[in-house]
Amino acid sequence: ALLLEAITLLEAPVAAAMPWPAGCPMPAPGEHRLLLWAAPDALETLPAWLAGLGGSVRWQVAAAAAGSGLPLRELSWNHTTLHWRAQHPGWTYLQLLLPHPEAACVDALRQRWGDDLLWHFEAVRQAGAARLAALPLVRWRGAEPLEALMAHCQELGAFVFNPHVITAEDGGLGVVDADQVAAKAAYDPAGLLNPGKLRGWLER
């Protein structure tokens, strides 16, 4: 078993646009990138493990020797989105928890939406189970196509955390979370932080 702290997978066009750390080679054309944050004991095992899956190590460095440049973690989660949109302002993004197994959902979305979707995956755990979250980059073609895309994701069993709405409730579970409201009351009783962001606070 490999002890991994985090896993990020970037589709080739996304990987090609990222500002890789000093010493890390740029991806070859068409090369996807898998970013792994591994325990020190796993570093010797990784090359053989990846080779068995048809991959190879492009760059490997211990955290203590990474230097003061851009950290690899800067290419994960929403950092990836920000780097892409700095170069491609005509794009936006979504946040999804994919159904398990994921391949059928991704294939169906790719077939319908083509290169209007570029894929970025993050490994997560939900109730102890390994899952894939996705932060796909989306070519902006207007509000109606975006709504149609989100509806298609939901039809395929993906959970959409909509980043294009104001309140936390509308972007997530769709209902007021009493624990969130209680936490805001405890830590921000005057409601100064992120005003209007928590619908449950406004409706209390």
Please name every model-derived segment.
Residues A1-E74:
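C-terminal substrate-binding/cap subdomain adjacent to the FAD-binding core in PCMH-type
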